[in-house]
């Protein structure tokens, strides 16, 4: 716990080092993050239930098909939200940013840049939610845990390293890289679990045939 708090303090220190306007813009986009993620969260809950029910019924083929359709719907939804954010995001961000002349204008620039980055890679986040939920529905908690650790490592590493190389723009990519880090664990993990389920069903069928 102590090391985690130390890392969080270090990350916050990096954010704070870019000044008040950057902090305000960064925080404004983070507040909007919940809106970007809301559909992904809902899809995730649905996929946990769907996967669990079909697993219990022994319909593993439906899990594979449902995951494919779920990912497709999630990605399409993310594209729609991305389009909406590019059209109306600047106006929405204005609700979270102070109207103070100089700093307000600078904060708006940072917030808009950050929002465009996150929106452009929103499909990565939606895949994360859906695949993680399917794995949880299969009864596996280790893979989602490991993905969370990778997500944390990527976010922290990017926050501490990228600003040194690319300035304030570097820190704006930390969240997106964290999503990618999680997906790098979840997608192979899902493929492994799917193969394991299909293999188990095949073995069960062989036993029943022998009987």
Regions found by a protein language model. Name each.
Residues 25-89, 125-147:
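Small-residue-rich hydrophobic transmembrane alpha-helices
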């Amino acid at each position: 716990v102590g090391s985690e708090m130390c890392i969080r303090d270090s990350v916050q220190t990096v954010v704070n080092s870019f000044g008040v306007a950057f902090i305000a813009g960064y925080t404004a986009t983070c507040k909007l993050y919940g809106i970007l993620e809301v559909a992904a969260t809902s899809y995730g809950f649905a996929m946990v239930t769907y996967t669990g029910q079909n697993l219990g019924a022994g319909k593993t083929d439906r899990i594979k098909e449902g995951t494919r359709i779920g990912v497709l719907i999630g990605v399409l939804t993310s594209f729609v939200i991305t389009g909406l954010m590019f059209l109306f995001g600047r106006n929405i961000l204005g609700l979270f940013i102070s109207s103070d002349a100089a700093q307000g204008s600078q904060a708006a620039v940072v917030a808009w840049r950050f929002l465009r980055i996150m929106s452009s890679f929103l499909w990565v986040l939606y895949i994360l939610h859906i695949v993680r939920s399917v794995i949880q529905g299969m009864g596996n908690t280790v893979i989602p845990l490991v993905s969370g650790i990778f997500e944390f490592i990527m976010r922290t590493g990017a926050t501490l390293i990228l600003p040194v190389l690319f300035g304030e723009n570097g820190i704006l990519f930390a969240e997106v890289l964290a999503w990618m880090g999680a997906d790098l664990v979840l997608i192979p993990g899902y493929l492994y679990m799917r193969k394991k389920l299909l293999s188990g069903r095949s073995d069960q069928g062989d036993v029943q045939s022998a009987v």
